[in-house]
């Protein structure tokens, strides 16, 4: 009954939920039982390293060294240096040699501050020292003073001068563009120096062939012009497959991008080049005529039916396939700038007759008009009234300037009252009597023709116009 009661009590005793309770480690037991002295006999040697195996390794390592063999490493690689075949020496890595130290010489306060870059070289005395002879007395040496200096006259009066110059030429380098005079020539008694000269030499006559080129040779724009004329490329703006759209907005000329998309302040495009646009699935352009436009090509100026037309060719993207290809028609956008009016015929009337103009600088044939002018009486009285006349004088200041003839300018001269008392005697009278404030002699009375001169001032009667 007693054993049954004990077995029943053991069965009723509660068991830990995890099964058998684990024993603490040797390190944990050593920390708690060392001070109390209740440690099991296998805990202290294991923690303190005094087991039999530890003693064998401790005393055996004093006589045998197995450090590089990797015994007990468990890696199987042979340690740090690896396995070495038997009978061979392991490879050794040469150690870098240390650099020799630099000797630093201290500099004192009295030493110079300038350090010489050249090392001081020691003087080596070679040879046997000069022998010394004993002296047994001396002799009296008498000297005399000479006033004439001991100078030798090297130059001679009648000897010739010989000058020789030797030049060395490097055959590997010759610069033909530089003309150098030849070296002086060796002479006897005088110096002869040659000057630079250029000699002519014969050249080879090479026959030249002329290329057979058709067309006008005076207006060739290229070195080898292509015969024939190339037709200008057609723009293809008025084809049957191109839609014609007239644009009224003048912004189409300056900023066509504003008609396709709304203004983007960050966009800085060039309106003269091809413009590319990208739209979302649903969009509304500012101008309905530019719906689905993805490209506007560069502008072109044409003339059609008497007008100047500004044109751009556009590309629509109405449909988009699954592969991303866009399909659309070509559109010709144009804006008429202005009509070309026919040339108007305006009746023009001359302001002055051409027959009354006289050029004072015109060349006159003296042989033909000399006889007629010489027989003309020049001793004639003036009426005293200045008649209006025209004179064309070229005003040139370095370059010829085309002037338009204007209206005549008349100047009334004062009329002398009679009787007139001359201040100088009239007799003997001159062969030629000239009246007027200024005058020009007839070319027939000039002995030598002078070169035509340019005058920068315009001279009129009595007045000078700057």
Swiss-Prot record:
Keyword set, alphabetical order: Capsid protein, Cytoplasmic inwards viral transport, Disulfide bond, DNA-binding, Host endosome, Host Golgi apparatus, Host nucleus, Host-virus interaction, Late protein, Microtubular inwards viral transport, Phosphoprotein, Viral penetration into host nucleus, Virion, Virus entry into host cell
GO biological process: microtubule-dependent intracellular transport of viral material towards nucleus; symbiont entry into host cell; viral penetration into host nucleus
Major localization class: virion
Ranges for region Disordered: 1-25
Top-level lineage group: Viruses
Pfam families referenced in this protein's UniProt entry, alphabetically: Late_protein_L2 (PF00513)
Skewed-composition ranges (Basic residues): 1-13
Known partners and oligomeric status: Interacts with major capsid protein L1. Interacts with E2; this interaction inhibits E2 transcriptional activity but not the DNA replication function E2. Interacts with host GADD45GIP1. Interacts with host HSPA8; this interaction is required for L2 nuclear translocation. Interacts with host importins KPNB2 and KPNB3. Forms a complex with importin alpha2-beta1 heterodimers via interaction with the importin alpha2 adapter. Interacts with host DYNLT1; this interaction is essential for virus intracellular transport during entry.
Name this protein carries in UniProt: Minor capsid protein L2
Biological source species: Macaca mulata papillomavirus 1 (Rhpv 1)
């Amino acid at each position: 009954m007693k054993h049954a009661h004990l077995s029943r009590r053991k069965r009723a005793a509660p068991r830990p939920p995890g099964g058998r309770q684990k024993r603490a480690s040797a390190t944990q037991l050593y920390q708690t039982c060392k001070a109390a002295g209740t440690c099991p006999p296998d805990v202290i040697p294991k923690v303190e390293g005094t087991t039999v195996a530890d003693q064998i390794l401790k005393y055996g390592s004093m006589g045998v060294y197995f450090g590089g063999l990797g015994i007990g490493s468990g890696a199987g690689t042979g340690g740090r240096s690896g396995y070495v075949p038997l009978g061979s020496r392991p490879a050794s890595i040469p150690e870098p040699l240390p650099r020799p130290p630099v000797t630093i010489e201290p500099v004192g306060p009295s030493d110079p501050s300038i350090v010489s870059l050249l090392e001081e070289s020691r003087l080596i005395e070679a040879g046997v020292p000069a022998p010394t002879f004993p002296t047994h007395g001396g002799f009296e040496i008498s000297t005399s003073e000479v006033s004439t200096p001991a100078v030798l006259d090297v130059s001679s009066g009648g000897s010739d001068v010989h000058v020789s110059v030797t030049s060395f030429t490097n055959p590997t380098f010759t610069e033909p563009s530089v003309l150098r005079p030849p070296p002086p020539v060796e002479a006897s008694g005088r110096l002869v120096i040659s000057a630079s000269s250029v000699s002519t030499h014969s050249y080879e006559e090479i026959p030249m062939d002329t290329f057979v080129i058709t067309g006008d040779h005076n207006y060739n724009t290229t070195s080898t012009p292509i015969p024939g004329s190339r037709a200008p490329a057609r723009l293809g703006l008025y084809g049957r497959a191109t839609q014609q759209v007239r644009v009224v907005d003048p912004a189409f000329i300056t900023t066509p991008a504003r008609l396709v998309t709304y203004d983007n302040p960050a966009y800085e495009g060039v309106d003269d080049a091809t413009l590319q646009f990208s739209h979302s699935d649903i969009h509304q352009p500012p101008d309905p005529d530019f719906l689905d436009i993805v490209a506007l090509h560069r502008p072109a100026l044409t003339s059609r039916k008497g007008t100047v037309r500004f044109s751009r060719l556009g590309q629509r993207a109405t449909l988009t396939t699954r592969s991303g290809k866009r399909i659309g028609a070509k559109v010709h956008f144009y804006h008429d700038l202005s009509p070309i009016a026919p040339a108007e015929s305006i009746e023009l009337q001359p302001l002055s007759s051409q027959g009354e103009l006289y050029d004072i600088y015109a060349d006159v044939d003296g042989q033909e008009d000399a006889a007629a002018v010489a027989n003309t009486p020049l001793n004639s009285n003036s009426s005293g009234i200045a008649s209006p006349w025209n004179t064309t004088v070229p005003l040139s200041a370095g370059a010829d300037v085309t002037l338009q003839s204007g209206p005549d300018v008349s100047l009334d001269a004062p009329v002398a009252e009679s009787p007139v008392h001359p201040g100088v005697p009239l007799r003997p009278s001159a062969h030629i009597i000239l009246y007027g404030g200024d005058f020009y002699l007839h070319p027939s009375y000039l002995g030598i023709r002078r070169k035509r001169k340019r005058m920068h001032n315009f001279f009129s009667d009595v007045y000078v116009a700057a």
